[in-house]
């Protein structure tokens, strides 16, 4: 049954999972608002009557969170607090048939590419001319820019292609228009995201076009920081580094998930790269862009992982001293090629290995942060909390990296850039004072 778009209707969008999901929710919000439907994000006031849950289905913990959130909304509906509950996103795409049977209280389920169908529930029209128009749920000074959808890689552990489909690039023209629209809204920093950045353009331009896209975005007036997330290491286009070095508003920052460093694990994961090749690439990146911040993500407990593999990974971290590291325990996902392997590393061992690896990185992070004491950095003010300002350098992305705690006698504006001298350093944070 369709939701009646009466004046009293107010839609709350709850977003779970990654920044790519967040962009999808912002696009949906923009379309609803353009159809004169009242919409909010993560509304805790319970003054809405319709909910759209945008789910994540990436790993077990994410699936659990998504299911619990849906159940919470169903309970609110049962108590008469909500009229409608709709579910979209990766969990819905992947398990819709099962979930429909288990949760009949949900009014409708949608996949990841069914925005027009969601809008039909509100008797709203999909407005193609609004491509790129979004209702931002982030602070107005930064936003994510999703440059493509889906992924053509075949990593053995990853279920994302099952939920998001094959790689589809957006055109450079459309992305530049969206970036310009974001800057008009007050955005100063854009984080480029995709399942895999470096594949960008191969489908529509028959070449790896990320360097051309970066050059075009760097020309957008008023865009002060452009940040790159999720670059695949195999066949990495080195031309990206030339653009990064040449253009001042492209952050000297690269998020490159490596997943492991043991060659046997990399082969089992189908990463199409060896430890030696990764080492060569890291040296090349750092030689071409001195001072670059390298972030990576790792997996602990992949099937067949031995203590020797873990030691190799720790040695790799100590050798290459990444600036930022995140780690996940392996999740055994059905319909992936790794699902045919025995999930033979116990959960407690996965957790212990992840902790062990992060302890190595924690020491590296502390040492690298200590080196920053006394230096002056350009810092973007993100928020004010407990009487202190919190910001980031160009070497830190939102939520996952260092924060700079800023002491200032004068009032600072959220979204303002200031020069900060670092006075103290901790494992994952810095302190400093405004200078100049």
Question: Which sequence ranges carry the predicted segments?
Answer:
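Conserved glycine-rich "GG(E/T)P / GGGxP" loop and the immediately following alpha-helix
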Residues: 57-62, 187-212, 216, 220, ...
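Short, electropositive alpha-helical surface patch
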Residues: 205-218, 238-252, 305-323, 347-352, ...
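Conserved, mostly hydrophobic/aromatic
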Residues: 155, 175, 192, 228, ...
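Proteins enriched for Cys/Gly/acidic motifs involved in redox and nucleic-acid/cofactor modification
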Residues: 1-200, 239, 250, 254, ...
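Radical SAM/AdoMet-radical enzyme domain recognition
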Residues: 184, 211-212, 219-226, 236-298
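Generic beta-strand/beta-sheet core signal
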Residues: 193-195, 229-231, 257-259, 295-299, ...
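Conserved strand-turn element in the central/C-terminal portion of the radical SAM core barrel
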Residues: 16, 154, 158-165, 225-234, ...
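Terminal RNA-binding accessory module
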Residues: 340-436
């Amino acid at each position: 049954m369709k939701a009646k778009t009466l004046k009293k209707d107010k839609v709350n969008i709850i977003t779970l999972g990654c920044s790519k999901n967040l962009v999808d929710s912002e696009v949906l919000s923009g379309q609803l608002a353009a159809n004169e439907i009242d919409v909010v994000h993560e509304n805790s006031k319970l003054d809405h009557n319709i909910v759209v849950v945008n789910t994540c289905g990436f790993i077990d913990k994410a699936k659990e969170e998504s299911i619990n959130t849906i159940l919470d909304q169903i309970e609110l509906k049962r108590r008469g607090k909500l009229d409608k509950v709709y579910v979209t996103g990766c969990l819905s795409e992947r398990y819709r048939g099962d979930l429909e049977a288990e949760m009949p209280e949900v009014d409708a389920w949608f996949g990841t590419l069914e925005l027009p169908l969601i809008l039909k529930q509100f008797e709203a029209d999909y407005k193609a001319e609004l491509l790129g128009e979004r209702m931002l749920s982030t602070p107005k000074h930064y936003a994510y820019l999703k440059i493509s959808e889906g992924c053509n890689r075949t990593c053995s552990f990853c279920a994302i292609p099952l939920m998001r489909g094959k790689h589809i690039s957006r055109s450079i023209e459309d992305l530049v228009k969206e970036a310009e629209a974001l800057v008009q809204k007050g955005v100063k920093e854009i984080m480029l995201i995709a399942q895999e950045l470096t594949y960008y353009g191969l489908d529509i331009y028959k070449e790896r076009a990320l360097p051309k896209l970066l050059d075009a975005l760097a020309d957008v007036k008023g865009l002060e920081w452009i940040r790159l997330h999720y670059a695949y290491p195999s066949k990495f286009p080195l031309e990206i580094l030339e653009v990064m070095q040449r253009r001042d508003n492209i952050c000297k920052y690269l998020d490159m998930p490596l997943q492991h460093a043991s060659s046997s694990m990399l082969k089992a994961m189908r990463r199409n790269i060896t430890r030696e090749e990764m080492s060569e690439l890291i040296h090349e990146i750092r030689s071409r862009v001195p001072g670059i911040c390298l972030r990576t993500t790792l997996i602990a407990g992949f099937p067949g992982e031995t203590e020797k593999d873990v030691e190799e990974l720790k040695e790799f971290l100590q050798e290459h001293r990444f600036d930022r590291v995140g780690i996940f325990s392996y999740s055994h996902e059905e319909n992936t090629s790794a699902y045919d392997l025995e999930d033979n590393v116990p959960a407690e061992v996965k957790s212990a290995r992840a902790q062990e690896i992060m302890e190595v990185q924690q020491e590296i992070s502390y040492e690298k942060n200590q080196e920053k004491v006394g230096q002056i950095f350009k810092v973007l003010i993100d928020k004010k909390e407990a009487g202190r300002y919190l910001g980031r350098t160009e070497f830190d992305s939102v939520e996952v990296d260092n924060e700079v705690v800023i002491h200032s006698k004068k009032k600072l504006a959220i979204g303002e850039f200031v020069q900060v001298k670092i006075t103290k350093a901790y494992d994952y944070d810095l302190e400093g004072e405004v200078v100049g």
